[in-house]
Amino acid sequence: PIHMFDMMRFLFGEVESLHAIGSTHEYKEVDDFSVLLKFANGMHATLATAADASWLFPFERVEVFCHHATLLTREMESLTCSSNVEGHFTVQTMHQLPREERWGYVQEDRAFIDSIVNNSPPLVTAFDGLMAVRIADAVYESVRSNKPVVIKQ
């Protein structure tokens, strides 16, 4: 889930606080989580993850709902977009792209190389990694305390 926290920050901004519940099923450590995140801009999001889920696809999906619009990804295989209340939608499939491109590795490498060649700030910094770890730590803290946790910036 740490990569999902990173992606949520990229898409929606800084996480202000969160409240999580967790349970232990297959492993000694807490392995299932449900997290409600509140962002500094007033948005909120949920994340559910299970370490003991089956191997049925999609392993990961993102659903975004706003202003009578919906975006839905399915395991980086497709993107479904609906932008009105009538229910019309479009589906873009990416399954024909090589995995490295479909999952963003090519674009990530290109952005990193461009930042070196052009002496420009990288798109991803150590601060981004730090914040993802702080959010993950806050999830465990919230599970232990059963209270919301404010994320230190």
Q: How would you describe each model-predicted region?
A:
Residues I2-S78, R102, V106-S120, K152:
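Contiguous beta-strand/loop segments that form the cofactor/metal-binding neighborhood of enzyme cores
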Residues V30-D31, N84-E86, A136-D137:
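Short secondary-structure transition/capping segments
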Residues S34-V35, L71-T73, T90, A138-S142:
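Alpha-helix boundary/capping detector
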Residues A40, A111-Q153:
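C-terminal helix-rich "cap/oligomerization" subdomain common to oxidoreductases
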Residues L56-R61, S82-G87, V91-T93:
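A short, polar/proline- and glycine-enriched secondary-structure boundary/capping micro-motif
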Residues A69, N84, N146-V149:
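Juxtamembrane helix-loop transition sites at the ends of transmembrane segments
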Residues V91-E101:
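C-terminal "lid/loop" region of Rossmann-like NAD(P)-dependent oxidoreductases
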Residues E101-R102, L130:
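Generic alpha-helical structural signal
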